């Protein structure tokens, strides 16, 4: 439970501040800007206290003080950007469970938009993915209860539950005339973040589904196992980050580091000019400089974009697919005490090694490959992106709305993947990067221009 704020206490604080301001003009002269900001802050808190007291005393039904404070906090944060949220103690515990990669639920990454849940991406091989939930779907009801009025954390909590229990989702999909209902059986979501196989004995395919605590260790094991399986035939690796919604910043950095010998991976810049952190690669490319292709699409967000941007800027990998989601902000988790939960607050923007912010723009691929999307999926898998989220942080320059997020369920229909295998087999080993337009043959699709 949040600690309740006493309006009387707020009033006392305001009174003291006003007295100090009125009786010490010299100090005001010296520190007018600081005091001005503080006084304005106190005035706004006093306004909050007045409204709080009126609502508590005069609302038609009895209003619980704790809920009023919760509503106020939720409103304050939702007005900042789509990714800043308050988590109560239970929500904070759930977040810690998420980063370990195991929880009971249905397996989707969601964000809140205009009071409804928007699917960023379903996690591979989870109940949601198997039930046909797609990126860009809008969830309006959970077990017949409207999502409108719930916080993001409350909605996520409702989707979790005992293994083998069921939940009904009412879904709105662009292109469908009517909403439809899906019943999903919850399962233990043990998110193995890395999957891999050897393609035709000479290309290592590695899919990273999210960035959780075990991701880098799982990646290195995949590289080692594929190298052993192939003998001396391995030509290179395809790293598939499509529909990967992101995750932990430190894992994005260490995954990038696994493929780089040196150089900056990402810089994180806060509000003040001095609040800049730079993260650089350590010596030792875990693949021994094997050629790389990175696959991205409109569902590749956040940590995925850090990896794709770093490898692209250093010309370590050729990036293939469609423009990424465009989430270029960093959220810090700020604990508020054991009983009070935590804030997940946007505290910085991140920049690729070349100094580009991808906020509301995304990473543009070196080779753009558009999938053949079945008619029933066309409307629901196109034009998603950070720039389409209400209240998003604005881009430094022109914003881009997003791109395709469809991945064909059958590998034989996956044009981006086939292009990646073709590129690897024709890539210059010395650079690990295919010069733009050089596919060793006719390009199977269009070549993207410079970012």
Predicted regions and their residues:
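C-terminal "post-core" interaction segments
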Residues: 4-8, 12-15, 19-23, 30, ...
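N-terminal activation segment of mature serine protease catalytic domains
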Residues: 35-84
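PDZ/PDZ-like domain micro-motif
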Residues: 43, 124-137, 192-195
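Conserved PDZ fold ligand-binding element
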Residues: 52, 128-151, 240
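PDZ/PDZ-like peptide-tail recognition elements
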Residues: 71, 83-121
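Short flexible coil/turn linkers enriched for glycine and charged/polar residues
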Residues: 100-104, 112-116, 133-134, 161-165, ...
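PDZ-domain C-terminal substructure recognizer with occasional recognition of PDZ-binding tails
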Residues: 115-118, 140, 154-195, 346-347
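PDZ domains, with a preference for the canonical peptide-binding region formed by the helix
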Residues: 138-170, 251, 327-334
